[in-house]
Each structure stands twice: as structure tokens, then as C-alpha cells.
Amino acid sequence: MKRDLLLTKIEEYKNIMPWYVLDYYQSKLSVPYSFTTLYEYLKEYKRFFEWLIDSDLSKAARIADVDLTTLEHLSKKDMEAFILYLRERPSLNTYSTKKGVSQTTINRTLSALSSLYKYLTEEVENEHGEPYFYRNVMKKVATKKKRETLAARAENIKQKLFLGDETMAFLDYVDKEYEYKLSNRAKASFRKNKERDLAIIALLLASGIRLSEAVNLDLKDVNLNMMLVEVTRKGGKRDSVNVAAFAKPHLEAYLSVRKDRYQAEKQDVAFFLTAYRGLPNRIDASSIEKMVGKYSESFKIRVTPHKLRHTLATRLYDTTKSQVLVSHQLGHASTQVTDLYTHIVNDEQKNALDKL
């Protein structure tokens, strides 16, 4: 979704929310949570508050009037009824045969509510320095995780990674072959953004930074002499991230055309730009997602920018066999989340079976 449209929709949701949700929004904006995350959370709150009113658990006539005491006194049974409602409600998609929403959607809803309840019961302060209330019913609500071993997840992800020579082959394909599949009109559009698109893909493959981190890069954050980028990690922490050398020529090529191609002025500090009605703007996440999907589908298989992050992490672990190094590169506080990459590159088990 374009940034302007995203912000417009966020304002629409804010206009119907209770005051304490607006407090929550302002607090999380300072962390900072991404606008995309906050938008998704506001959607979940709207659905939850509508259910509270429809179920007579709140006497409010509109969402903005749902008071804090309603949330404070909801029971575990009430929350389980909401989960059952999500699981059993008719799908909003006319063409779907599913009866309710997916478990992934339910987990996202519960995550949003857990975040709100934690804010209201632990993080916020009233005039007396106390939270608005203390009873957090979400701590009693169990979530159902997707049943899948690391090995199974690794095998599924592996098919969507550009490992080994495929990393450079993908870049070469976009650089030298992709345009020959296009019409003359499409070629003109491709050539206009070719250097930028290659720079984005190369940076993601060479650093493993998140999509949001790439979008929010400013010119001052990129040091091509040291091959470092400064990013804002989850939780608002600043971090210096090393970038593999193979990205340098693509980043340099983009910088050489950035000013003239996108009519960039001194005040246009965003590193990656797009032209909208002749004016330079920071590129948004949805544009990068579509761009990566388009090129990767033409090359091999449609993937997301996050799979390019997985690609870097897997290649780095395959080379170093160090989960600590990989976790530092990705900006993770522990090595637990990097266990996945050990399974992707772990051929020892297969080799042992072959010898039986």
C-alpha cells in the first residue's frame, strides 16, 4: 500500500477509536512501530470493538465510546468466545469456502490485543503514575502455534531462496536478461528504474536488512567506503550493518543517476526514491514488494523481500557456521531465531542416511 494511502486509512481508523487506543497509537509511534504494523493493529481493534458491541459486552453505541472498564472486566471466557467467533464466522471473501479466518489471522488478532492490554496494564501512566488498570486477561489466553518442525519449515523456505550461485545469477538476470521479455513500452519503464531496483535487490541480498529498514534509509545512513548502512531496528535501536562487497557497484550505479533521474534536491534525504507526478518521494514498502515479486517470478519463483533476508542469513551461516555472527548481522538479540538456517544448510543428516 502506498504511504499516502496508508496514512489516510490510519487516520480513518483513528477517528473512530476510543481515546486510550489513540494514546496507545501515539506511544507505539514513538518506539517506533511501523505505520504498516499500526495500521494492521487498528484494523484488529475495530473488529474486536465491533464484536464487543454486537455481543452486548459493551453498552456503547459506537466504538469510540467503549470504555476502559469493559476491557478491564472481560473474562477469559469472553476472550475465548471472541476467538470462537473468529474461527466460526462466515468468511468475508465471497469466493472462499472457508468458514472462518485462518489461524494465522487469529494469532495476529491476539498479538494486537496482547500489545494493547500490556500497554494499558503495564506501560502507560495515569496522573498518579499508575497504569489504567492491572488485570490483563490476555495473559490467560492461549495461542495455537502452527505445527511444523524446524526441518519442515526449512525445507519449505529453501525452495524460495537464491542460494549459492543463484544470488549473483538473479542480479545478472535483472541486469542483462529481464528486459528482453518486455514490450517496448514496458522496457522504457524498466530502464527508468533499473539502477534503483538493482541497488535495492543487491542491498537486501548483501546485508539481510528488513524491508522497512531499507525503505527508511537516508543518504547519510549509507557509507560505501566502509560498506556499512545505519538502520533503525525493531524497538527503535540504531544499528550498523555490514554490506557484502558485491552490492557496491549496484549502489554506486544508482547514486550516479539518483539526482537527475528522480529530480532529487538537497531536501530529498531518502536514499531510495521514486518519482510521483514528477516529484521525488521515498519509495514505499509495497512498491519494493511488487518489484521483488515481479523480478523473482520471472527469474525462478515469486518471493518476498523477507526471503532475500533469509537468503543472506543462510549463505552467511553456510560460510561461517556461526549462529552468533548471523544473529548479529540480522539484528537479533539471541541465536534462537537463527536455528532455522542451521536446518536449511544441514546436509550432514542426509549424508549419513546415504551411507546406510
Swiss-Prot record:
Residues 169-354 form the Tyr recombinase domain. The keyword DNA-binding applies. The active site is at R210, K234, H306, R309, H332, Y341. It comes from the Bacteria. GO terms for molecular function: DNA binding; tyrosine-based site-specific recombinase activity. Gene3D superfamilies: 1.10.150.130, Intergrase catalytic core. FtsK is required for recombination. Residues 16-121 form the Core-binding (CB) domain. GO terms for biological process: cell division; chromosome segregation; DNA recombination. The keyword DNA-binding applies. Site-specific tyrosine recombinase, which acts by catalyzing the cutting and rejoining of the recombining DNA molecules. Essential to convert dimers of the bacterial chromosome into monomers to permit their segregation at cell division. This is Tyrosine recombinase XerS. It comes from Streptococcus equi subsp. zooepidemicus (strain MGCS10565).
